[in-house]
Amino acid sequence: MSQKVLPTKINLIQFRRQLRLITVIKRLLENKREVLLLYLRTYASEYEKIYNEVNEEMKKVYESYLQAVASEGISNIEEIALSQKPSLEVSSSIKVIFGVKVPTIKLDKSTIPPKPFSDVETSPYLSESYEEMTEALNKIIELVELESTIRSLVSELRKTQRLINSIDNYILPFYRGSIKFIKQILEDRQREEFSRLKIIRRILQRRRESGSG
């Protein structure tokens, strides 16, 4: 590719200027990569924490549910569940983290349905399961938001790394090779010009010497 570059002093100056600019861009991208990695480590740690909390919450929900089934019977539990219409609503918006758009998700607590059963007429385990599930919902929503955030950050990190790789593997070698090529041609021309001048000086010197003789 360097051989297609016109070897002129102007091009040499321009290529050197562009190389400096590309080097600055690469440094900025590397800084961005480091910040993204820092955010990712922070969010991954938070995700692991919430994930473990959700697991513990859901274990409690499941244990209470199994005890409620044993007490009430699966058919009664299913009848209560089927009597309810889906009502949960979540709202989502976008926030920006270091130039990366990530979702925010919130549960509308007013849409959580009230208990569709009486505490007096049903097993206390059923009420316990309902309350534990209600508490777990917010953490589940938070977990979903964290997962989406991590995916967005990973996607941006991959794009940034691809740009850095492109600069390292293609752009920088092209500019460095082009500068080397232009310098070599200009130096060769300078040497040729210097040699021609020496020859001309010798010829002129001989003429002067022969004329004076």
Swiss-Prot record:
Component of the A-type ATP synthase that produces ATP from ADP in the presence of a proton gradient across the membrane. Keywords: ATP synthesis, Cell membrane, Hydrogen ion transport, Ion transport, Membrane, Transport. It comes from the Archaea. It is a peripheral membrane protein. GO terms for biological process: proton motive force-driven plasma membrane ATP synthesis. The keyword Membrane applies. GO terms for molecular function: ATP binding; proton-transporting ATP synthase activity, rotational mechanism; proton-transporting ATPase activity, rotational mechanism. HAMAP family: ATP_synth_D_arch. Has multiple subunits with at least A(3), B(3), C, D, E, F, H, I and proteolipid K(x). Its main location: membrane. The keyword Cell membrane applies. Belongs to the V-ATPase D subunit family. It is found in: Cell membrane. Pfam families: ATP-synt_D. This is A-type ATP synthase subunit D. InterPro entries: V_ATPase_D. One of its GO terms (cellular component) is plasma membrane. NCBIfam families: PRK00373.1-3, V_ATPase_subD.
